[in-house]
A protein has these predicted regions:
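Conserved donor NDP-sugar-binding/catalytic core segment of glycosyltransferases
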Residues: 102-137
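A conserved acidic beta->alpha catalytic loop
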Residues: 42-51, 70
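Glycine-rich, basic loop-to-helix element that forms the pyrophosphate-binding segment
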Residues: 67-88
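Short, flexible, basic/aromatic active-site loop/helix in glycosyltransferases
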Residues: 143-172, 176
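Short beta-strand-to-loop acidic/aromatic patch adjacent to the donor-nucleotide binding site
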Residues: 89-102
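Short, acidic, metal-binding catalytic loop of nucleotide-sugar glycosyltransferases
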Residues: 27-36
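A short, conserved alpha-helix in the catalytic core of glycosyltransferases
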Residues: 172-191, 195-223
Length: 286
């Protein structure tokens, strides 16, 4: 068996009301090359998600699950899954896969190959596309600059254009829907910040990976379908609240210290002033 064929990837899938896609997600993860172990962490689903997970676990010894009695948030659950992979010492790579991501057989192995080219000192994401083939703008992002957002609305766009000349494109951040990094790097940066309940935890992790001297990049040659928003449709207000809360936390953690009191107050007003409008749009969304 060559290095490219070694099964040393531990996959973490966090679910919450994910019954629409979890069967397809796990079927594809189980068929993926290089997977040594799979850990599903369910955050108190009440829609039959756990029954689907249990069925997969019954026929694949690599798959085990944690059933949380409540919903501690995505970041906490990701850390739980990574911790649950501590025993299989052959899972030297960690892949965090959303339950609405449909990987191809070679997707994870190819992400691992890209990370290996950077001596494992990298966090790598995929070229995410919707079911309609449209690219997910969250797959390639720059860090938020909230002071710039106060000056011009255009600065609120975080997406970065794809560079077709590069198979591996360095960016500030990739989407948490699918990311792969070495266990060593994950532990070096302390994993996910569990204070994020939902949204911006991926921006935070990518920022700390870069601050640790590692590379964040998206593999433009690894395309994966991401059926966005499956879990969030049932709780639009909850999602919008924590999206805004996550952005405010990111600002306080990484940007606020170098901004004046006036700028900090203006950013607070901008972030939370936008929440009622975003919440109304979410409620009216079909």
């Amino acid at each position: 068996m060559t290095m490219a064929e070694v099964d040393d990837i531990g996959v973490v899938v966090v679910t919450h009301r994910s019954v629409e896609t979890i069967d397809a997600c796990l079927s594809r993860v189980r068929a993926a090359t290089g997977v040594a172990a799979i850990r599903v962490v369910d955050n108190a689903s009440d829609d039959g998600t756990l029954a689907v997970v249990q069925r997969h676990a019954a026929c694949d010894a690599r798959l085990r699950f944690v059933a949380n009695p409540d919903n501690p948030g995505f970041a906490v659950a990701c850390n739980q899954g990574a911790h649950a992979l501590a025993q299989p010492q052959d899972a030297s790579w960690l892949a965090f896969v959303n339950p609405d991501c449909l990987v191809e057989t070679d997707s994870l192995a190819r992400l691992r190959a890209h990370a290996r080219q950077l001596d494992g000192n990298a966090l790598v994401g995929a070229d995410l596309v919707g079911e309609d083939g449209q690219r997910d703008p969250a797959a390639r992002r720059r860090d938020p600059d909230f002071a710039a957002m106060l000056r011009t609305p255009a600065a609120r766009r975080l997406d970065v254009p794809v560079d077709p000349a590069r198979s591996l494109q360095q960016v500030d951040a990739v989407s948490g829907a699918l990311m792969l990094l070495s266990r060593v790097l994950f532990e070096r940066v302390g994993g996910f910040d569990g204070a994020y309940r939902l949204h911006a935890e991926d921006l935070d992790l990518c920022r700390r990976v870069r601050e640790a001297g590692a590379v964040v990049a998206v593999a433009n040659d690894v395309r994966v379908v991401h059926v966005r928003g499956v879990s969030s449709r049932s709780r639009p207000l909850f999602v919008e609240w924590h999206k805004h809360r996550g952005l405010w936390r990111w600002f306080r953690k990484f940007e606020a210290k170098r901004r004046s009191a006036a700028i900090r107050a203006a950013v607070f007003t901008m972030v939370w002033g936008r929440f009622p409008v975003a919440a109304m749009r979410a409620l009216l969304r079909p």
